[in-house]
Amino acid sequence: MATIDELGCPLSFDELAEALGLLEDTQREALSRRLRAMIRDGQLIRNRRGGYCRVNHADMIPGRVIGHPDGFGFLKPDDGGDDLFLVPREMRKVWHGDRVVAQVSGTDRRGRKEGVVIEVLERAFSSLVGRLHIEKGVAFVLPDNKRIPQQILVPPDQLGDAADGQVVVVAIDEHPTEWRQPIAHIVEVLGDHMAPGMETDVAIRSHDIPVEWPADVFEQIADLGEEVPEAVKQGRVDLRKTPLVTIDGEDARDFDDAVYCQPTPKGWRLLVAIADVSAYVQPDSPLDREAYNRATSVYFPDRVVPMLPEVLSNGLCSINPHVDRLCMVAEMYFDAKGKTYRSRFFEGVMNSHARLTYDQVRDMLEHGDPELCERFAHVLPHLRDLHALYKVLHAARERRGAIDFDSVETKFRFDDNGKVAEVIPLERHDAHRMIEECMLAANVAASRHLLRKRMPAIFRNHEPPSEEKLEDLQQFLAELGLRLGGMPHPSVKDYAELLEQAKDRPDYHLIQTVLLRSMMQAVYAAENKGHFGLALDAYTHFTSPIRRYPDLMVHRAIRHLLTGSKPAEFSYSHTQLQIMAEHCSANERRADEASRDSADALKCEFMLDKVGQVFEGLIVSVNSFGLFVELADIYVTGLVHITALDRDYFHFDPIGHRLTGERSGKAYRLGDRICVQVAAVNMDERKIDFVLADGRGQEDEGVRRGSRRRGRNRDREKRRAGPARDAAPPRGEAASRARRGEWSEEKASATDRDVWRPAVPGWGQPVEEASARSTKEKKAGGKNVSRKNGRKVAKKVTSQRHPVHRGSRSRS
């Protein structure tokens, strides 16, 4: 750096080597490696003449590209500064996820800084998955990743046995430039895009979810048996006679927690026993490195990609009934008001006395089911004690001000052919909440224990809403005659009081949704900043080390203290923990996106035979380009594009979350109920189009005219409006990672409940999450066929009046 600065001009490799006096081949090779690393890290760039020059942070900005399906993008600077807007011309050079150096080129008409890409430091993708299209002898792949809208050319001699329309994996031979499309060759044919399970296969590959286990992991676990060796049980607290039980969903396969409660003179004693994963996964072992690489288990509608091999996740680390298991135990004592007055952690060995489901527990506690009560008579008294403690803890949580947003979680029911037969809501009752309170209590106890001992660890932070979001929220509430207390720094209790005040209003859902969207995203960090949504001064994740790497790290920190070691002697520094926390947060988001993509594809497939049908729905998002509507009872979301609304010019109010007609004054607002007709399903883009079904703009000719215009008008509207700031699809579709909509293992909702960190596009996310579709229609065989980049989408247009399918379920 000093040499380049001193000479004040770009230097070639030979000039640099000479200036540094590096003449030996080994020295030059070392210099070459160092220069490559500095380019990768954004310290240097190499110009087109091969000269190395320093990145001047005054005008050169290294960062990562965030792509948008519509072709534009952003540069997210490494230093956390303001994003740079990248116009489509610049995005032709790069892909979503690439690390680049950009330069500020000016500002657009909205005042945003625009940038030009100077150098690509690191490519994000060496392979991609997508659908193969062959048109007039030209073969190209459309990536499944919608943030990469470019076609990838495949030379004729690289097609192999792949056929038009199949889903393939391609290896990139030439990345895109401003003047050249990317070129690739096919390395794997996944099969027909409608094959059962293909949605998940594609999501796994599109998001680079690790599936295969490295050979050294198999070598490490080869000697693990099905039973815990007697030798490793020594020195642990023996809990095998304590009637600990697991309570999970019916289809759960891995059981990582067990509970036991008993009354005491002051209140209750609660044991939360967690599978002792850290006893088997040693730091920096092959198993540990792969667990860190994955960071989390990924839950899809039809399968799970685990963080740990099955011999551990479903075997030695799963608290199966009537077998000995190693555990890490949180022992907590609560007074009559639910306040913890003593807690400790210890290593134990346990034997689960029963494997219970949520519904079984509910049927015993609420309905007194005689058969179940007799079958589980040996644990029923302790379940009643646990339920009594739950009521006290829940009341304490309400007094604290923690909020619990209403949402509907859903799951898929598949037929014998692996196709979606039904999208059904998951019932959540006191048995779920009872376990949730136990897990929250253990997580809180772990965080306070670590802080009290000044132990370095990974925490789960949820910061208060930003000033900008609060300002928008206040403007919205003012229109409704409401006010959020505690401004300019409201507490979560202020949120809870506002929800209580509004609970009987007809627009309650609207108010709740806007409050939810004002929340920040929960993340992992090495520094504790508290948890706003739970109204806690400290929080961490302790209860799920089978499926979350941060929990495993918390177990290691607690074990370090249990051995009598000093915090300063911990194997991980604060810097290392922060890097690990950021990695885990990123992989958590990746898992959410992959799960959502799979679920979206399945919902589109489910709706294919429903084109033309009419449903009642709820407006769950309003944008400059239209309305997102969630259908009642089946919880599927689609877009009513602005061109399919009444014949009027609609103004978008981002604060009021509404579109208002200029001439008619007709307003469509978040939370309104409307009737829609399913107009089109696009499997390639995983999008569903609706039109109004109540006569307004629904005439046959009007629909056809709107359909013909829809593609170009969508693009025009979004270009005019710029990035949408309020693109949230359905409530009930995973209000958080811990409450993924189609996650069949309900324990997720009973352990974390970061309901303020939605895993749906646009909720607390930048513009790139807001998606819309552009189509161009062509009449064919009595149906309209929209074609985009060679993809055909069936559309049905009908003037027939359909009755409204009103479900019996009332949703508010």
Locate the predicted segments by residue.
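Electropositive polyanion-binding surfaces
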Residues: V169, H175, D192, V202-I209, ...
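Charge-lined substrate channels and their catalytic hotspots, especially those that engage the 3′ end
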Residues: M1-L271, S278-C327, R355, Q360-D363, ...
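Intrinsically disordered, low-complexity mixed-charge segments
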Residues: M1-A2, L7-D14, L23-L35, G42-G50, ...
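A short macromolecule-binding patch
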Residues: D82-V87, I148-V154, Y635-D653, D700-G706
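Non-cytosolic beta-sheet module surface loops
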Residues: V65-G67, L132, I619-S621, A680-N682
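A generic structural signal for residues embedded in beta-strands
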Residues: A102, V170, V622, V676-V678
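Basic/aromatic-rich interaction segments and small domains that mediate binding to polyanionic partners
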Residues: D79-D83, E90-K93, N623-V636, D684
